[in-house]
Regions:
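A cross-kingdom feature that marks ATP-driven nucleic-acid transaction machinery
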Residues: 3, 12-21, 25, 31, ...
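Short glycine-rich substrate-engagement loop in P-loop NTPases that contacts/grips substrate
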Residues: 45-75
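Conserved ATPase-coupling elements of RecA-like P-loop NTPase cores
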Residues: 57, 82-91, 115-116
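Conserved catalytic/switch belt of AAA+ P-loop NTPases
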Residues: 88-111, 118-120
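Short regulatory helix/loop adjacent to the ATP-binding pocket of P-loop NTPases
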Residues: 111-126, 142
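Interdomain hinge/linker elements that couple catalytic modules in large macromolecular machines
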Residues: 129-297, 303
Length: 374
């Protein structure tokens, strides 16, 4: 089994007093990880909240009944916890009234789960995000040389665990993931009724990775007003399908100040959405795929490392651009991301170096990818 980065972090706080929440898209391995970690224990109680009777059980429950149900169990796992009404209050009932029991809750939507647990569980929880497999996890599973060789494959099929483990069946698995799981939680949100428009929106975003996104222009393309586009994008982001990268602006008048790019957390899902599994050698979007790959993997690494770095891209009105920036503790790191090795010596724009003279600048290609992802 592929070792997950979160395993050690979660293991270190098991049997503690605080609840644990693990949020991430469906099928990234949240339940698999917990089952593997807790398989040798007999004091674990599992609730799968995709099941109707489990949701009914929690609908109107008291601490007395919870104590009776939990009995001698010391860990209670609540899977897909966002589906339970007032789940934060239910977890608080357990943590406040049954102090010897630790709750571990998983959720596939921060839009729902975070809003339901943050206030009731203030100071009572440890929160983690879980992503599809990472470049670093796969390097640890095999080795650096092997995973670098696999990068073109990952850029097409992504890092979902079942996809990685289903060699030769990647398209079938991605089809099921994108059709059966991708929209399950999103379409259950209040007022998300235009499912066909949502699919068109996601397809439009898939074609624009690496490019600046205008809510007005996308709205005209898919037939939605700009406010609805922004709301749907917010929900897609909080369902761990996409993420936004904003433009960096500090010192120059001609820097773009309110722009954004949108990327996918997993390129297999991105390619499934538009039905394009062509190999990278024949693709016209290979540069955009590589940019998405590097930035998504860097953000995953930063999250697991506990980094507080803020992430941006930089661009001027004269179209001078840097693909990816990080700022932490007043220090800036700038990365230009190039698939073509012949562009490995691309210089940093002079206007940027003058405005931010102490920036650490680096061009990222396949040959030095470990310098940013390990």
């Amino acid at each position: 089994m592929i070792q997950r980065t979160l395993q050690e972090k979660i293991a270190s706080i098991l049997n503690g007093k605080k609840a644990v929440t693990i949020m991430g898209a469906r099928q990234v391995g949240k339940s698999t990880l917990l089952k593997m970690m807790l398989s040798d224990r007999t004091d674990v109680m599992w609730f799968n909240d995709d099941e109707y009777d489990v949701r009914e059980l929690f609908s109107d429950i008291t601490s007395t009944r919870l104590r009776s149900i939990i009995a001698d169990h010391r860990i209670v796992v609540i899977d897909e916890a966002q589906r339970i009404q007032d789940i934060g209050l239910k977890i608080k009932l357990i943590t406040d009234n049954i102090p010897d029991v630790q709750v571990i809750a998983t959720g596939s939507s921060s839009f729902e789960l975070a809003s339901k647990i943050n206030e009731p569980l203030t100071g009572r929880k440890r929160e983690y995000k879980m992503f599809p497999l990472t470049f670093g996890e796969m390097v640890n599973h095999t080795n650096l040389l092997e995973e670098v060789r696999m990068i073109p494959h990952r850029m097409v099929y992504g890092y979902y665990p079942e996809v990685v483990e289903s060699v030769g069946e990647e398209r079938a698995v991605l089809k099921e993931l994108s059709e059966s799981y991708l929209y399950r939680d999103i379409l259950s949100f209040d007022k998300i009724m235009k499912s066909a428009k949502l699919v068109k929106l996601l397809q439009a975003l898939a074609y624009q990775i690496g490019s600046q996104v205008s809510y007005n222009e996308i709205g005209q393309t898919v037939g939605l007003d700009s406010k609805t586009v922004e709301r749907y994008i917010d929900i897609l982001e909080k369902s761990y399908i996409i993420f936004r990268l904003k433009s960096y602006a500090r010192n120059l008048r001609n820097e773009l100040k309110a722009s954004r790019k949108i990327y996918f957390w997993d390129l297999g899902i991105r390619n499934a959405v538009i039905g394009n599994y062509s190999q990278v050698e024949s693709r016209t979007d290979v540069g955009n795929l590589w940019e998405n790959f590097v930035i998504a993997e860097r953000l995953k690494k930063n999250h697991y490392d506990g980094s507080y770095a803020q992430s941006w891209f930089w661009r001027t009105q004269q179209q001078k651009e840097i693909d990816y920036l990080e700022e932490a503790d007043g220090e800036i790191k700038a990365f230009e991301i190039k698939w073509n090795e012949r562009k490995a010596h691309t210089k940093c724009p002079v206007i940027f170096t003058k405005a931010y003279p102490n920036t650490d600048y680096k061009v990222i290609t396949q040959k030095n990818i470990e310098s940013i992802l390990l």
